[in-house]
């Protein structure tokens, strides 16, 4: 069995990460997923949260925030097709906190004509982004 696998993290806008990795952890729809080289093929939806990539030969893990998407696992590679993806180093805590505040206000305001499902999705994404920022801080 190989010790590394090819990992691709892409969004509609750009390729966020492409390289060899020893391990990938990410938030699956049913819970946290850990992928090692040679993993059984799998296609599943992913929830908003942090993707942690253990890069071969590096002490520091790579972090990418994804706002949901699809995970495809093949024996020699992993592809994350994210709705939105942001490199861990590019996460903006103030912006995420403001998005959370606005989504909470929209859900509380009974007189506004909002799409509650959309507001709830935006709130979940903002909360997941803030949690990813906290995780990234703990790792450093």
UniProtKB/Swiss-Prot annotation:
InterPro entries from the UniProt entry: ATP_F1_dsu/esu_C_sf, ATP_synth_F1_dsu/esu, ATP_synth_F1_dsu/esu_N, ATP_synth_F1_esu_C, ATPsynth_dsu/esu_N
CDD domains: F1-ATPase_delta
Highest taxon listed in the record's lineage: Bacteria
Pfam families: ATP-synt_DE (PF00401), ATP-synt_DE_N (PF02823)
Keywords: ATP synthesis, Cell inner membrane, Cell membrane, CF(1), Hydrogen ion transport, Ion transport, Membrane, Transport
Compartmental location: Cell inner membrane
GO cellular component, one term: plasma membrane
Subunit description: F-type ATPases have 2 components, CF(1) - the catalytic core - and CF(0) - the membrane proton channel. CF(1) has five subunits: alpha(3), beta(3), gamma(1), delta(1), epsilon(1). CF(0) has three main subunits: a, b and c.
Listed PANTHER family: ATP SYNTHASE DELTA/EPSILON CHAIN (PTHR13822), ATP SYNTHASE EPSILON CHAIN, CHLOROPLASTIC (PTHR13822:SF10)
Membrane topology: Peripheral membrane protein
Protein encoded by which gene: atpC
Record GO terms (molecular function): ATP binding; proton-transporting ATP synthase activity, rotational mechanism
Family listed: Belongs to the ATPase epsilon chain family.
Role, per record: Produces ATP from ADP in the presence of a proton gradient across the membrane.
Protein name: ATP synthase epsilon chain
């Amino acid at each position: 069995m190989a010790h590394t696998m090819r990992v691709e993290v892409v969004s509609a806008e750009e390729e966020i990460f492409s390289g060899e990795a020893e391990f990938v952890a990410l938030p699956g729809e049913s819970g946290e997923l850990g992928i090692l080289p040679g993993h059984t093929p799998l296609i599943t939806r992913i929830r908003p949260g942090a993707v942690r990539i253990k890069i071969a030969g590096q002490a520091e893990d790579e972090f990418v925030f994804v706002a949901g998407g699809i995970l495809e696992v093949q024996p020699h590679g992993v592809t994350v097709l994210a709705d939105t993806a942001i490199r861990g180093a590019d996460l903006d805590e103030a912006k995420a906190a403001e998005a959370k505040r606005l989504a909470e206000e929209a859900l509380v305001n009974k007189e506004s004509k909002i799409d509650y499902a959309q507001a709830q999705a935006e709130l979940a994404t903002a909360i997941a982004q803030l949690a990813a920022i906290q995780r990234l801080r703990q790792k450093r």
